């Protein structure tokens, strides 16, 4: 419903951008002032700016649906920076006009130069952001757990989250992730949810993606938990629609579970596994997902109550919530994703006010919490001010 209420605001903002586009381009050359050019520009802009809606409504043919969704993801990111830069330029114009009484700002040359600066800035940020999102960094962590892991002195974990396989990520992204993982020669691979992007059909050639993921090499295997986007849920410009009680079951897509099984990824849903009689891996249900599909999840204490707490306990939980409760439950290493570290500016700043640990490392008593910015993106197909990453965690055990 919120998407419907915000639609008039979105329309007004696009009209605002289009108006200033006419003014700036028109001052570059008289040909751009013609009615024909204005009509063509308006048609092209409307077609692109409405792709969030048309991609939501038009499902077939599948090829057109994909084009609209991909275009929408790129446009939403670019539009965000168009709006920020145009608003900034307009504020500067008003200050120059009413505070400094600068008469030269009304000249054609001033408009043309201002427009060129704005266009260059948008292009620079957008191209850089789109390219940067596709580059995956390797972020290292060193952790010491004051417990014995039987004969195991250390453990190398590769930790990823938020792959968001779909319109923004497919076979190329999967190959890059697997290549980076295998290069680390891990003992264990953990995936903290949001493997999918709300729509299984969004994955282009899922069989190929599964085949690629099966090539992950690790001594003890690959373990994962669900994230809030690991369900079949219609999205309009980032806003979801609640299907109600009768539609809750429709959100579950069995193909997602089958995808993980075929990819040799073991899904843990409020479950714990003892590996090599040395340490536990616990996968937790996602807090947001269970509300939508009307299920319940166990508390951290319930998940660990039957475990041998003398052994190291590794938690995989999509969202970095209830950190104190998790620490009190005897967990030694808590691995989370979800935040994307804000993904794009200014989100990378505001995210710090929303989470106790928005990204990186935090210690709670003897528990180590690591939140990754994710190896993929959600929504806008870009990263500005943040990195796509996989994490390597070298865990040292204090064997007595």
Predicted regions and their residues:
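Soluble catalytic domains of enzymes that build or remodel membrane lipids, polysaccharides, and related
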Residues: 148-400
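Hydrophobic alpha-helical transmembrane segments in integral membrane proteins
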Residues: 112, 122-147, 167-172, 176
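Non-catalytic terminal accessory segments
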Residues: 1-134
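Short, functionally important structural connectors and interaction interfaces within domains
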Residues: 63, 128-130, 135, 144, ...
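Short, functional N-terminal and low-complexity linear motifs
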Residues: 40-43, 59, 108-110, 145-148, ...
């Amino acid at each position: 419903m919120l998407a419907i209420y915000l639609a008039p605001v979105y329309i007004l903002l696009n009209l605002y951008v289009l108006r200033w586009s006419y003014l700036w381009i028109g001052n570059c050359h008289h040909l751009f002032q013609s009615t024909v050019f204005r009509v063509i520009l308006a048609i092209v802009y409307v077609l692109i700016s409405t792709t969030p809606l048309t991609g939501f409504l038009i499902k077939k043919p599948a090829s057109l649906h994909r084009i609209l969704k991909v275009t929408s993801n790129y446009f939403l990111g670019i539009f965000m920076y168009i709006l920020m830069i145009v608003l900034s330029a307009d504020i500067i114009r008003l200050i120059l006009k009413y505070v400094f009484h600068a008469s030269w700002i009304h000249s054609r040359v001033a408009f043309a130069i201002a427009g060129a600066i704005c266009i260059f800035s948008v292009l620079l940020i957008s191209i850089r952001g789109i390219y940067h999102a596709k580059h995956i960094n390797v972020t290292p962590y060193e952790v010491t757990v004051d417990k014995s892991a039987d004969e195991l002195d250390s453990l190398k974990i590769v930790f990823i989250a938020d792959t968001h396989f779909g319109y923004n990520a497919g076979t190329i992204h999967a190959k890059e992730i697997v290549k980076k993982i295998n290069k680390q020669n891990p003992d264990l691979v953990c995936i903290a949810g949001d493997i999918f992007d709300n729509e299984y059909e969004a994955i282009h050639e899922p069989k190929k993606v599964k085949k690629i993921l099966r090539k992950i090499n690790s001594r003890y295997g690959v373990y994962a938990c669900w994230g809030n986007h690991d369900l079949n849920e219609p999205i309009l410009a980032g806003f979801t629609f609640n299907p109600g009680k009768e539609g809750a079951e429709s959100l579950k897509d069995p193909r997602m579970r089958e995808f993980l099984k075929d990819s040799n990824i073991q899904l843990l849903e409020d479950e714990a596994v003892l590996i090599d009689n040395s340490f536990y891996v616990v996968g937790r249900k996602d807090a947001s997902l269970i509300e939508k599909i009307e299920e319940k999840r166990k508390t951290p204490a319930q998940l660990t109550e039957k475990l041998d707490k003398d052994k190291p306990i590794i938690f995989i939980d999509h969202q970095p919530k209830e950190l104190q409760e998790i620490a009190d439950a005897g967990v030694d290493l808590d691995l989370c994703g979800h935040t994307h570290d804000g993904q794009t500016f200014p989100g990378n700043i505001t995210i710090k006010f929303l989470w106790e640990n928005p990204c990186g490392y935090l210690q709670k008593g003897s528990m180590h919490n690591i939140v990754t910015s994710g190896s993929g993106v959600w929504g806008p197909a870009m990263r500005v001010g943040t990195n796509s990453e996989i994490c390597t965690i070298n865990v040292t055990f204090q064997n007595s």
